[in-house]
């Protein structure tokens, strides 16, 4: 058996706001927008061919799977458009070794790095 794809699940306050952020800033594609019980929704975003983000409301996770509601994982994205993304997202933050960090509208931080491969 082998792994064929990866989805990182992020638990956020507002699924739509965070989805809009990734669609606007990283040109993510919405690949699923599905209902959950009690009127909640989940959105899956294709970031690259190898990575999908699954956005879930924190309130839903707290109610149905509280054992997994923990800290946000540290995500590192690689790009060939580093300078353009730094101009868009860097907000004056320092660059270090070809990386910079940026925040989404809820204050979750991510790292962007120059693609060196």
Positions of predicted regions on the chain:
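Short amphipathic alpha-helices within nucleic acid-binding modules
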Residues: 21, 83-88
